[in-house]
Design a protein with these regions (language model features):
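Extracytoplasmic electron-transfer domains, predominantly the class I c-type cytochrome c fold
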Residues: 2-56
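Solvent-exposed, polar/charged alpha-helical surfaces in well-ordered, non-transmembrane soluble domains
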Residues: 4, 18, 22, 46, ...
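Hydrophobic residues at beta-strand termini and immediately following loops
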Residues: 6, 131, 180
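Sec-exported extracytoplasmic/periplasmic mature domains
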Residues: 25-29, 38, 50-60, 104, ...
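Extracytoplasmic/secreted cell-surface and envelope-processing proteins
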Residues: 32, 121-122, 161-163, 187-189
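Flexible, polar/low-complexity N-terminal or interdomain linker segments that lie immediately upstream
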Residues: 53-110, 119, 200
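Positively charged, proline/Ser/Thr-rich regional signature most characteristic
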Residues: 86-160
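Catalytic cysteine-centered active loop of the rhodanese-like fold, especially the PTP/DSP P-loop
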Residues: 141-187
Length: 200
């Protein structure tokens, strides 16, 4: 999956009308969606934008199978890959573009989704482990490697929940830790890859 569908409820919950219209007019990079700016009139594009927006509440998705929780053996993505070369701001925050590039380059890293588990089931960054912000401190590091592997957390806040988890890990001696600076909503709006439950 290279980008969420325009009718994806998670996408519609956060995408603005202007962003939807832009996607219709100009297409979406690295996807099969073509540009319709020269194929449709401005009125038709406005009508299509309004229709897609209406799917926020009027679209009934097919039943979904919940994504299975990752096993500890699968926590590290690309375990044989190189460590990513991140630029960390304020000793904590990493630009989402660098994380997306690390995934494309098959770098070694761990990604933590610190939102609620229901949000993780709905949509998450590929390979992300659900470690909700309300997890107890004695369980937060369960199964996580404490070596040179980068551990990257994200939330929707865009910092509060992931900051909490990273603080807990740092107290336990985890050094290569960071938070996706822009948060999950901006990850979606950038059309970066997300996955969720499969339709039955």
């Amino acid at each position: 999956v290279t980008a969420p569908a325009l009718a994806n409820p998670a996408y519609l919950a956060f995408a603005t009308d202007a962003y939807i219209k832009y996607a219709i007019e100009n297409g979406r990079e690295d996807t099969k969606m073509q540009a319709f700016k020269n194929a449709l009139s401005p009125e038709q594009i406005d009508n299509l934008t309004a229709y897609i927006r209406s799917l926020t509440s009027g679209w009934s998705p097919e039943p979904r199978e919940l994504s299975p929780y990752p096993e500890p053996k699968d926590y590290v993505l690309n375990p044989e890959g190189k460590n990513p070369d991140f630029t960390i701001k304020q000793d904590r925050y990493v630009p989402m573009a660098q994380v997306e590039k690390a995934l494309k380059d098959k770098n070694k890293l761990v990604i933590l989704d610190t939102r609620t588990t229901s949000e993780w089931h709905n949509a998450h960054i590929p390979g992300a482990i659900p470690i909700p912000y309300y997890i107890s401190e004695d369980k937060v590091a369960s199964g996580l490697p404490n070596d040179d592997t980068w551990i990257i957390a994200y939330c929707s806040c865009p910092h509060a929940a992931s900051d909490k988890i990273i603080n807990m890990l740092r107290k336990k001696g985890y050094k290569n830790t960071a938070v996706i600076d822009e948060g999950f909503f901006n990850w979606i709006n950038a059309s970066y890859p997300i996955i969720g439950g499969k339709t039955k």
